[in-house]
Design a protein with these regions (language model features):
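Active-site histidine-anchored catalytic micro-motif
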Residues: 1-134
Length: 134
């Protein structure tokens, strides 16, 4: 199995980061198989969504509505509302699997692979790409 870790600097901002180009580069020339995208973090997830039409902010706003950033959480270290970040992986999985055909991601027309990072306390993130040949 081919595998690679990609390091991302997210700074002190929360948000959605498009990693589709990095994923496409990783599988280029690999033939048919499956790409697993994994975020080894307790407060980040991987999603396949449309980007560039406001969906990124819609996702963050929806997560903020579902998981308010206040002091209701028992997990209280870090910035205010950080406990919400630790609930995120139950809603946005830390991994996604994308089919690959002839070395290309078989995503839909508007689909992109993104890192969902609501946690501004961690300025650096890792994403692991793993390719399993078919």
């Amino acid at each position: 199995m081919k595998s690679k870790v990609v390091n991302l600097h997210t700074g002190n901002r929360r948000g959605v980061i498009d990693i589709t180009a990095a994923a496409a580069e990783f599988v280029r020339g690999e033939g048919d198989g499956l790409l697993n995208v994994f975020a080894p973090h307790a407060t980040a997830g991987i999603a396949v969504i449309e980007t560039g039409a406001g969906s990124e902010q819609d996702l963050m706003d929806s997560l903020d509505s579902l998981l308010p950033r206040d002091d209701r959480y028992r997990h209280r270290h870090g910035s205010r509302g950080h406990g919400a970040d630790h609930v995120l992986p139950a809603l946005v999985s830390p991994s996604a699997v994308v089919p690959v055909g002839a070395g290309k991601l078989l995503l839909g027309t508007w689909q992109a692979i993104v890192l969902v990072d609501p946690n501004a306390d961690n300025p650096d993130r890792e994403v692991r790409f793993s390719f399993l040949a078919g």
